[in-house]
Amino acid sequence: PMSYLQDLVNIMAYYKMNTLQVHLNDNGFKQYFDNNWDKTYAAFRLESETYPGLTARDGSYSKKEFIDFQKQAATNFVEIIPEIDIPAHSLAFTHYKPEIGSKEYGMDHLDLFKPETYQFADNLFKEYLKGDDPVFVGKRVHIGTYEYSNAKKEVVEKFRAFTDHYIRLVEGFGNCLLYTSPS
């Protein structure tokens, strides 16, 4: 709940910790859900008008709540870095729109070879980054970009192009993009 995040920021401020990365989406491991992606728990925790029905029903933040949270954290000198984790850990997105899921690597991975994947993720990021008063208030945004397959050269190159695309998209809104370098 938001009250937990607010308490966490207060504790961080007390100990002079100044950065909190908030994962807005993630999912469980399918082996704990009968090896079935359809049963595997996944959630996206931020209100979305672009994709009605995407937002988790068992706990989420309204846009206003999240904006207020970021601004309040800033008064305590704590920067909130929102993360929309793509192209892996994306089961919440593929539960919502199954056709963008990877059949080869698992439904918690976006299919990097489908144009609809880019359209979906572009629109999602734009919803939170565009305008004079964007939902993501700070300058830094995290996009995940880790734990995707490196087994095939064509997939690695597509992953590189995918990452480059989102670097340009996020930075095009004047934000600094953060991502986790794949190992």
Predicted segment positions?
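Feature activates predominantly on carbohydrate-active enzymes
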Residues: 1-109, 116, 122-140
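Long alpha-helical, hydrophobic tracts
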Residues: 63, 104, 146, 154-155
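Helix C-cap/helix->beta junction micro-motif
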Residues: 76, 173-174
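Short acidic/histidine-rich active-site segments
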Residues: 84, 142-149
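Glycine- and acidic
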Residues: 106-111, 148-152
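Active-site cleft segment of glycoside hydrolase catalytic domains centered on the general acid/base Glu
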Residues: 147-166
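Conserved small/polar residues in nucleotide/adenosyl-binding loops
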Residues: 179-183
